[in-house]
């Protein structure tokens, strides 16, 4: 079977951009979609993002660092001492004014790594590193040894 995979990532609450990307992928004949995390925030999109995502054949999804930020804010892991944490608390408060809790539960269930096999080729899908979905280890100016963490004996 011929596969056309559209890779979605870093939506960050931008409903307009997600609509445009999905439309473009559909016009190009995408047969499946892989979502690499960061669905919510800081943009204003909420339920409509998940409605769009449920309208496409999403066959792999991993949790991104902003997804974790939302969960950490909801779980009371942020305080009022750090301005960044205050901002995330306020953004999450706005988010939860209309976001269905079923979507929060879905995000909470997402793994950090998904393994896929397509036509005999093995993929390892992550938002960043297999055990860490945040940080700058993969920036181009950094030591390339960090890229080795993306490959294992189950990845081509």
Per-region residue spans from a language model:
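N-terminal active-site segment of His-dependent metallophosphoesterases
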Residues: 1-56
